[in-house]
């Protein structure tokens, strides 16, 4: 398939910035929440600077190992992730790390722990627009290896496993604490099934990230902080739990980006 890159000065319609503004960056870190972009960019590297804010996409540039790295929010869910990836690919981004929050469904995983997802159950609709359901949602080996090595080096409490990516926060994740409490028949009992199969966590973006990246020829990985432990409660943990996870996630992500920027094979 031919690839269509943007002109250096072209402002891309959705993200609202140009390749020229990326200063040659080829690695992007992707939080979901636009409000987390600025603190993340400043925590990850040096000389952090604002690029643009348009729709759900807030973007900053930071420097890790003296190399420009993009930090860009994706909003919630697969559609906005795929749009972001399409436009970042046109501007020369090659490697991506999702930086998010998640709810675990396994007793062995605790609040504040880190999950590195190596694959995802495709409960979303977006990925089906890029590949049939038989096609696996798997992370880049290189990016995932970098994340695991960085987690080991940081001494983080991490788990490597599989996510279940749902288009919805309530029914698709079999949550009954919604406005009506209604969960369609097709989703009832599914959390127990995913638990039995060893799935670690529910979230809303990773399957779209992995499948879209593969379709576009990009390399992607995902690291998430655990803020809900659904074997105990449906409630999101207090902010201090996220802050603890955020600190480790920053160390892990920075370490992984440093490895990826070395442009050499990564060995276990």
What does each model-identified segment do?
Residues 105-107, 124-125, 167-174, 231:
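Short acidic/glycine-rich loop or secondary-structure boundary segments that cap or lie
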Residues 1-146, 150:
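Metabolite-binding pocket within alpha/beta catalytic cores that recognizes anionic/polar moieties
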Residues 146-154, 212, 252-263:
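Generic non-transmembrane alpha-helical segments
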Residues 230-268:
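His/Asp/Glu-rich mid-to-C-terminal helical/loop segments that flank catalytic regions of hydrolases
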Residues 188-227, 232:
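A C-terminal functional module that forms or caps the active site or interfaces directly
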Residues 31-35, 76-79, 83, 91, ...:
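Conserved active-site and cofactor/substrate-binding residues in soluble primary-metabolism enzymes
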């Amino acid at each position: 398939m031919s690839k269509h890159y943007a002109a250096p000065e072209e402002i891309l319609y959705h993200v609202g910035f140009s390749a020229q503004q990326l200063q040659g960056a080829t690695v992007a870190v992707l939080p979901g929440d636009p409000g987390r972009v600025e603190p993340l960019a400043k925590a990850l590297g040096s000389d952090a600077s604002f690029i643009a804010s348009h729709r759900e996409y807030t973007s900053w540039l930071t420097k890790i190992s003296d190399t420009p790295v993009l930090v860009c929010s994706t909003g919630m869910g697969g559609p906005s992730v795929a749009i972001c990836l399409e436009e970042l690919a046109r501007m020369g981004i090659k490697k991506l790390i999702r930086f998010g929050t998640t709810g675990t469904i396994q007793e062995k995983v605790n609040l504040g722990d880190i999950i590195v997802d190596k694959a995802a159950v495709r409960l979303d609709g977006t990925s089906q627009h890029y590949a049939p359901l038989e096609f696996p949602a798997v992370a880049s080996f290189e990016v995932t290896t970098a994340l695991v090595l960085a987690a080991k080096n940081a001494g983080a409490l991490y788990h490597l496993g599989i996510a279940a990516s749902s288009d919805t926060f309530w029914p698709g994740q079999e949550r009954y604490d919604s406005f009506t409490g209604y969960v369609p028949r097709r989703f009832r009992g599914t959390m127990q099934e995913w638990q039995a199969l060893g799935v670690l966590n529910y979230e809303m973006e990773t399957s779209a990230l992995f499948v879209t990246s593969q379709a576009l020829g990009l390399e992607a990985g995902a690291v998430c902080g655990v803020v809900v432990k659904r074997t105990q409660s449906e409630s999101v943990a207090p902010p201090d739990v996220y802050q603890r996870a955020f600190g480790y996630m920053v160390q892990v992500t920075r370490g992984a980006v440093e490895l990826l920027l070395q442009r050499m094979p990564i060995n276990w």
